[in-house]
Structure formats: structure tokens, C-alpha cells
Amino acid sequence: MSKILIAFASMSGNTEEIAELIKTSIEPLGHEIEMKEIENINTQKLLEYDGIILGAYTWGDGELPYEVEDFYDDIETLDLTGKKVAVFGSGDHAYPKFCAAVDILEERLMACGAEIVEQGLKVELAPETEEDIERCITFAFNFAGRLEGAAL
């Protein structure tokens, strides 16, 4: 099975809640999963994973949160060619750029050669509705399936 990293930044707990939901959805499939806060990631270690799932909330008017900035800068020099990745995030529609951190991270990962295998998951605040929970589970299953080469 594949080695997967789920790295996230969460201020209010919403993004961490999504990360936990993704992790518990993938775990029964037999993958080796490591979950860490993004600010504790040595970016060189990303090369050791078969799949990478990143999560971040959006700060202010569509910016990356402070704890993601160093990570974002550090991955610019990495060659992530062949790495299968996906990005998720929490946001608030009260702000003009809903979940912009998801798009910012996807763009950087693609610029580094990574393959986005599942469209970014954007959740309003926390996954509290049945629909949001189902979207998180589907995101997780699709990522795991595409990591193994077959979309679910």
C-alpha cells in the first residue's frame, strides 16, 4: 500500500476536523498514513511519500495563513514530479476569496511538477452537514483510488 502524508494548518479546528475525516476515510483501505501540522513538516521529507494531501484555512482576504508561508516558500525548489497530491481547505463565504489558500497551494504544487489527482475540496467552516461530510469522504476515497491508479 501507499505512504500518504496529510499535512494541515488549522486555527479554529475546522481544517483539522476535515483532515481527521479524510484520514479516517482512507485508513481502512490499508494505506500508511501520517498526519502532521504543516508548520512541522520538513519539506525534503515530502519526497518520501507516494501521496500528499495538504489542508489550509484561508486568512484575511484570500491569503495563506502565517503557519503555511514558510512551507509554501520552501517547496518552491522541490521537484515533485510524479507525486500525486490533493488540497483541501476551510473558509468562510463572508470573505471575498472563499478558500483561496486551496488554489494558491495547488498552483505551487503544479509548478513543482506534482500531479493534482483530485480537485480541491473547499468546505464552508467545518464539515457539519451530511453533504459536507459526504464530500470529504468522497474526496478521500477518490484520492486513494487515484493514488493506486484507478478512480473510484
Residue ranges and their predicted role:
Residues 1-2, 152:
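Short, Lys/Arg-enriched, disordered terminal segments
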Residues 2-3, 116:
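Secondary-structure boundary/capping motif
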Residues 4-5, 34-38:
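Contiguous segments within soluble domain cores/interaction surfaces
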Residues 4-25:
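N-terminal beta1-alpha1 ligand-phosphate binding loop
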Residues 8, 12, 39, 57-58, ...:
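Short loop or secondary-structure boundary microenvironments that flank
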Residues 17, 25-29, 34, 48-152:
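FMN-binding flavodoxin-like domain, especially the glycine-rich phosphate-binding loop
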Residues 40-45:
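Short acidic active-site motifs
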